Amino acid sequence: MEKRYELNKNLAQMLKDGVIMDVVNPEQAKIAEEAGAVAVMALERVPSDIRKQGGVARTSDPKMIKEIINAVSIPVMAKVRIGHFVEAQILEAIGVDYIDESEVLTPADDLFHINKKDFKVPFVCGARNLGEALRRIGEGASMIRTKGEAGTGNVVEAVRHMRTISSEMRKLQLTPKEELMTVAKEMGAPFNLIEYVAEKGRLPVINFAAGGIATPADAALMMQLGCDGIFVGSGIFKSDNPEKRAKAIVKATTYFKDPEVLAKASENLGGAMLGLEISKLETEFAERGW
């Protein structure tokens, strides 16, 4: 089991410095692949549509996911509800490359997340803070992402979550060793992972940005804040020119420290997706899970 987990972490490392795009059909998946995406997330409704339409959001139709798998050569991810291990069993059976236990879908279990160590396929999970990140890693997550606030086109929550995780890691590095067990208790996180972060100053898995990223500048901002890569959900295919915006966000993620490249990548993209103010949301997806 330990060897499998190490392999999954290494598989996730291969996505580092890349962009993962939400797609709802094979045509969008091909656009994402041609734009330079390192993987796609297959789902029936992007987060902005889930937010707009409401109701219970579940994992996508396996047939649709298989069509996307067959359409592209890059890895395909798909989402399951928090705690819904049977949805995860189904996705593993149809051959997805990664499973996202996602707060964007309606949680199936308000007490427990999936024990990801029961699966061979690697999992990605969202986190708002270091405690959440380490709990998910303790359950077997091979990759972490900020929760942000998906479907809003508003990057503020992703920034908040990344800054929180980074500041808590810096604080942990300054914590005396004899106090680490108390920190583990307070965070509800495995002690060995607390020790790892205190020593290394980073998570033991890669950490991507997700939730509200809509522009090349948003992607570069999150990379400069220390993220290992970018998830873009509604931001591409809810914009005026998806093909051009997809390529621009990939370029911005690669050249995130070069303002001249960022300026050029941001030109003539057409309108970005309509953004939402966080304080006016009826449902905050990031509050789901623990």
Curated annotation (Swiss-Prot):
Highest taxon, organism lineage: Bacteria
PROSITE patterns for the chain: PDXS_SNZ_1, PDXS_SNZ_2
Catalyses which reaction(s): aldehydo-D-ribose 5-phosphate + D-glyceraldehyde 3-phosphate + L-glutamine = pyridoxal 5'-phosphate + L-glutamate + phosphate + 3 H2O + H(+)
GO molecular function ontology, one term from the record: pyridoxal 5'-phosphate synthase (glutamine hydrolysing) activity
Binding positions for D-ribose 5-phosphate per the UniProt entry: 22, 151, 212, 233-234
Keywords: Lyase, Pyridoxal phosphate, Schiff base
Disulfide bonds: none
Active site residues according to the UniProt entry: 79
Entry EC no(s): 4.3.3.6
Pathway of action: Cofactor biosynthesis; pyridoxal 5'-phosphate biosynthesis
CDD domains with a match to the protein in the record: pdxS
Classification via NCBIfam families: PRK04180.1, pyridoxal 5'-phosphate synthase lyase subunit PdxS
Function: Catalyzes the formation of pyridoxal 5'-phosphate from ribose 5-phosphate (RBP), glyceraldehyde 3-phosphate (G3P) and ammonia. The ammonia is provided by the PdxT subunit. Can also use ribulose 5-phosphate and dihydroxyacetone phosphate as substrates, resulting from enzyme-catalyzed isomerization of RBP and G3P, respectively.
Quaternary assembly: In the presence of PdxT, forms a dodecamer of heterodimers.
UniProt family annotation: Belongs to the PdxS/SNZ family.
Name recorded for this polypeptide: Pyridoxal 5'-phosphate synthase subunit PdxS
Organism: Clostridium botulinum (strain Loch Maree / Type A3)
Upper lineage: Bacteria, Bacillati, Bacillota, Clostridia, Eubacteriales
Gene: pdxS
